[in-house]
């Protein structure tokens, strides 16, 4: 294992959303510079972790093909109603072989190559349950990035109970646990493609 890889962490690519602002298209499979968005993310995240898991509720064969070079496994949500990122997070936590999981959405092709190291450093320093990325712009405005986070997989049962009780908001569930915020100054690294317009904007950068 390379020295740059943080030990005992599973990487989780979140690709199980409904993508309503893309007319239901599978975001992770949309092309940026001729390459699926999900593959951009896999290439940047896989080198920072011990193993990769992909949360996907459709096109599992295609995601398995994209993930094969990284040894990634594809897992669906435990529910069939597209319950959002918390459901994908739960699926990944259940599938993880490591005690920690770090998640990232499938439509953020420029995510930081030091994402895991920085989240893990704060996680350890604060003895936290969750470390969440927060971007800070030139005007010092802070924007939480809850789908970029490092979590203990031992929280899976608590998350399952929260989902069963109807919780769908990621930050609301994080607030139940000891969460540390980790500042990132390059907000461009977290740009995503929630719509066709945002995908076109990414292509112009």
Swiss-Prot record:
Keywords, ordered alphabetically: Cytoplasm, GTP-binding, Magnesium, Metal-binding, Molybdenum cofactor biosynthesis, Nucleotide-binding, Transferase
Cofactor or coenzyme needed: Mg(2+)
UniProt subcellular location: Cytoplasm
UniProt: GTP binding residues: 14-16, 27, 77, 107
Main localization category: cytoplasm
GO biological process terms held by the UniProt record: bis(molybdopterin guanine dinucleotide)molybdenum biosynthetic process
Enzyme class, spelled out: transferase
EC numbers, comma separated: 2.7.7.77
Binding site for Mg(2+): 107
Domain of life: Bacteria
Coiled-coil region list: none
Reaction(s) catalysed (UniProt annotation): Mo-molybdopterin + GTP + H(+) = Mo-molybdopterin guanine dinucleotide + diphosphate
GO CC list: cytoplasm
Assembly with partners or alone: Monomer.
Comment text on domains: The N-terminal domain determines nucleotide recognition and specific binding, while the C-terminal domain determines the specific binding to the target protein.
Family affiliation: Belongs to the MobA family.
Protein name as annotated: Molybdenum cofactor guanylyltransferase
Organism: Burkholderia vietnamiensis (strain G4 / LMG 22486)
């Amino acid at each position: 294992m390379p020295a740059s890889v943080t030990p005992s962490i599973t990487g989780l690519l979140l690709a199980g959303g409904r993508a309503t602002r893309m007319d239901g298209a599978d975001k992770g499979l949309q092309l940026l510079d001729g390459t699926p968005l999900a593959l951009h993310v896999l290439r940047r995240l896989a080198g920072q972790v011990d193993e990769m898991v992909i949360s996907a509720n459709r096109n599992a064969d295609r995601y398995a093909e994209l993930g094969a070079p990284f040894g990634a496994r594809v897992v669906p949500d435990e529910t069939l109603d597209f319950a959002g990122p918390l459901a994908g997070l739960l699926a990944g936590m259940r599938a993880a072989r490591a005690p920690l999981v770090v998640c990232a959405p499938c439509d953020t092709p420029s995510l930081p190559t030091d994402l895991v190291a920085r989240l893990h450093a704060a996680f350890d320093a604060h003895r936290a349950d969750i470390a969440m990325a927060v971007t800070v712009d030139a005007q010092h405005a802070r924007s939480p990035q809850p789908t970029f986070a490092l979590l203990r997989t031992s929280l899976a049962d608590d998350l399952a109970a929260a989902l069963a009780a109807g919780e769908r908001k990621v930050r609301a569930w994080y607030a139940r646990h000891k969460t540390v915020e980790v500042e990132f100054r390059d907000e461009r690294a977290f740009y995503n493609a929630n719509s066709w317009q945002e995908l076109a904007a990414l292509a112009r950068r």
